[in-house]
Amino acid sequence: MFDLAIFENMFFWAIINFLILYLIYRKFFFKKVTAFMEKRSKMIQEQLDFAAKSKEEAIKLKEEYENILSQAHAKANEIVQNAMIEAQKQADKIIEDAKLEANKIIENALKQLDIEKKKQINELKNQFVSIALLAASKVIEKNLNTEENRKIVENIFDEAGVA
């Protein structure tokens, strides 16, 4: 039935076959496979290193760009602030110039008004003198009493339109 001797013999030859195949594979294939695996492992490691380096550079660039961007925002804010300050200065200057111009106009108007007032006063004085001379000449012509002189002067003023 079952012969153990045959089984032991087959087992022996199987081990021998396995060792021979192992030596052949080792001689011809394992070195190539090991070299290929090492080469592949090295290439993968290089790619991982390159990816890590690229990631670090990307992070550095991102930080640089964020720094540049924040500086640009700060510069823009500074420019806006300076522009607002300058605009306020110009607005204040325009307002001050307008006030000065308005004061000059008012001053000129007051001078013109004063000149016109003096002119009117002189004209009234001249009219008053004319009226007084006219009244005096009429008083002298009639040489009446004081009451009559007063009435004559009042009549002359009424005729001249002076109240």
From Swiss-Prot:
- Which parts form a coiled-coil structure per UniProt? none
Q: Which domain of life is it from?
A: Bacteria
SUPFAM superfamilies xrefs: F1F0 ATP synthase subunit B, membrane domain
Ranges that cross the membrane: 4-24
Question: What's one GO MF term for it?
Answer: proton-transporting ATP synthase activity, rotational mechanism
Identification of the protein by name: ATP synthase subunit b
Which family, according to the similarity comment?
Answer: Belongs to the ATPase B chain family.
Q: Which NCBIfam families does this entry report, sorted A to Z?
A: ATP_synt_b
Instruction: Specify whether Nucleotide-binding is a keyword of the entry.
Output: no
Q: Which gene encodes it?
A: atpF
Q: Name one GO cellular component term.
A: plasma membrane
Describe the subunit structure. Answer: F-type ATPases have 2 components, F(1) - the catalytic core - and F(0) - the membrane proton channel. F(1) has five subunits: alpha(3), beta(3), gamma(1), delta(1), epsilon(1). F(0) has three main subunits: a(1), b(2) and c(10-14). The alpha and beta chains form an alternating ring which encloses part of the gamma chain. F(1) is attached to F(0) by a central stalk formed by the gamma and epsilon chains, while a peripheral stalk is formed by the delta and b chains.
Instruction: State the protein's purpose.
Output: F(1)F(0) ATP synthase produces ATP from ADP in the presence of a proton or sodium gradient. F-type ATPases consist of two structural domains, F(1) containing the extramembraneous catalytic core and F(0) containing the membrane proton channel, linked together by a central stalk and a peripheral stalk. During catalysis, ATP synthesis in the catalytic domain of F(1) is coupled via a rotary mechanism of the central stalk subunits to proton translocation.
Q: Which terms are listed as keywords in the entry?
A: ATP synthesis, Cell membrane, CF(0), Hydrogen ion transport, Ion transport, Membrane, Transmembrane, Transmembrane helix, Transport
Q: How does it sit in the membrane?
A: Single-pass membrane protein
Localization: Cell membrane
